[in-house]
């Protein structure tokens, strides 16, 4: 037998000895995720990230994270078939400030709308907002029976489908091109674009279940902290403790003007 140390025994002690288990969560911190001021409920949840160690900074690990939230959770509403994607753009204290990143309908809603004996009409268009965001909007609509119609089917002719698709693209382009991202999101929350399309297409063929089913973010302008702060209002910029920050609508009469103050 060769004279020398048995490396295996001296190095690790007992063969197959267990390593000391370190809880990975002890090195992590919780951050609050804040939605922009367009939504009623601002505090949408928490996210984990490893603490800053050397050159690895925690805030860099948070930037670019995408959160998918139901509109029901953002608006404290019952209608829950719209999902909004929010992306973290900046970190202030323990708050992740997010911006709109996309929208989608839930799978069960889409499946419930597709039925027999009707025509499904889809359209998509790439549009740039006034503040430089390039969005791709997808729209869907379905034909319905006319009043007093006896026939079971309600299929649109190819020419009518083309006219409706053209109308969809025109309305989506018009609604997005003339507004900034904040105003576009405010239109997507109640889906006023879908309702406008439904009204405009009644003369061609009656439609129902018209929705902007998806919005994709294709290009963004250069990040500006000032614009993000505007989206979040004062609540996003201050490092307040987490809590349910909810906004409430103030009802005012038409033509309301605030009273003039004598002294400031």
From Swiss-Prot:
Species of origin: Mus musculus
InterPro entries, alphabetized: Ribosomal_eS1 (IPR001593), Ribosomal_eS1_CS (IPR018281), Ribosomal_eS1_euk (IPR027500)
Positions of crosslink type Glycyl lysine isopeptide (Lys-Gly) (interchain with G-Cter in SUMO2): 34, 249
Subunit structure: Component of the small ribosomal subunit. Mature ribosomes consist of a small (40S) and a large (60S) subunit. The 40S subunit contains about 33 different proteins and 1 molecule of RNA (18S). The 60S subunit contains about 49 different proteins and 3 molecules of RNA (28S, 5.8S and 5S). Identified in a IGF2BP1-dependent mRNP granule complex containing untranslated mRNAs. Binds with high affinity to IPO4. Interacts with DDIT3. Part of the small subunit (SSU) processome, composed of more than 70 proteins and the RNA chaperone small nucleolar RNA (snoRNA) U3.
Subcellular location: Cytoplasm; Nucleus; Nucleus, Nucleolus
Phosphoserine: modified positions: 237, 263
N6-acetyllysine: modified positions: 34, 56, 249
Pfam families documented for this protein: Ribosomal_S3Ae
Function: Component of the small ribosomal subunit. The ribosome is a large ribonucleoprotein complex responsible for the synthesis of proteins in the cell. Part of the small subunit (SSU) processome, first precursor of the small eukaryotic ribosomal subunit. During the assembly of the SSU processome in the nucleolus, many ribosome biogenesis factors, an RNA chaperone and ribosomal proteins associate with the nascent pre-rRNA and work in concert to generate RNA folding, modifications, rearrangements and cleavage as well as targeted degradation of pre-ribosomal RNA by the RNA exosome.
Residues bearing PTM ADP-ribosyltyrosine: 155
Modification comment: ADP-ribosylated at Tyr-155 by PARP1 in presence of HPF1.
Organism lineage: Eukaryota, Metazoa, Chordata, Craniata, Vertebrata
PANTHER family per UniProt: 40S RIBOSOMAL PROTEIN S3A (PTHR11830)
Region described as Disordered: 233-264
Family per similarity comment: Belongs to the eukaryotic ribosomal protein eS1 family.
GO MF assignments: mRNA 5'-UTR binding; structural constituent of ribosome
Record-given protein name: Small ribosomal subunit protein eS1
Modified residues (Phosphotyrosine): 256
Keyword annotations of the record: Acetylation, ADP-ribosylation, Cytoplasm, Differentiation, Isopeptide bond, Nucleus, Phosphoprotein, Ribonucleoprotein, Ribosomal protein, Ubl conjugation
BP-aspect Gene Ontology terms: cell differentiation; cytoplasmic translation; negative regulation of apoptotic process; ribosomal small subunit biogenesis; translation
Entry's Gene Ontology cellular component terms: cytoplasm; cytosol; cytosolic small ribosomal subunit; endoplasmic reticulum; nucleolus; nucleus; postsynapse; ribonucleoprotein complex
Composition bias, Basic and acidic residues: 242-255
């Amino acid at each position: 037998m060769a004279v020398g140390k048995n490396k295996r025994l001296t190095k690790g002690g007992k063969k197959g000895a267990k390593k000391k288990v370190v809880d990975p969560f002890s090195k992590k911190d919780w951050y609050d995720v804040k939605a922009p001021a367009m939504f009623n409920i601002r505090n949408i949840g928490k996210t984990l990230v490893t603490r800053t160690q050397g050159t690895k900074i925690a805030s860099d690990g948070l930037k670019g994270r995408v959160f998918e939230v139901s509109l029901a959770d953002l608006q404290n509403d019952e209608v829950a078939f719209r999902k909004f994607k929010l992306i973290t753009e900046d970190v202030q204290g323990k708050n992740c400030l997010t911006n709109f990143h996309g929208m989608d309908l839930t799978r069960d809603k889409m499946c419930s709308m597709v039925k027999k004996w009707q025509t499904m009409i889809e359209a998509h268009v790439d549009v740039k907002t006034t503040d430089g965001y390039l969005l791709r909007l997808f729209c869907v609509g379905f034909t319905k029976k006319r009043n007093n119609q006896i026939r079971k089917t309600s299929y649109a002719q190819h020419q009518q489908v083309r006219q409706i698709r053209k109308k969809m693209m025109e309305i989506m382009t018009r609604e997005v091109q003339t507004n900034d991202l904040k105003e576009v999101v405010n239109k997507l929350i109640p889906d006023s674009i879908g309702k406008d399309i439904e009204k405009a297409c009644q003369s061609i063929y009656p439609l129902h279940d018209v929705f902007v089913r998806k919005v994709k973010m294709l290009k963004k302008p250069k990040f500006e902290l000032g614009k993000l702060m505007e989206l979040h209002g004062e609540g996003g910029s201050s490092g307040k403790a987490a809590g349910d920050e909810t906004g409430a609508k103030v009802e005012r009469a038409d033509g309301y003007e605030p009273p003039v103050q004598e002294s400031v």
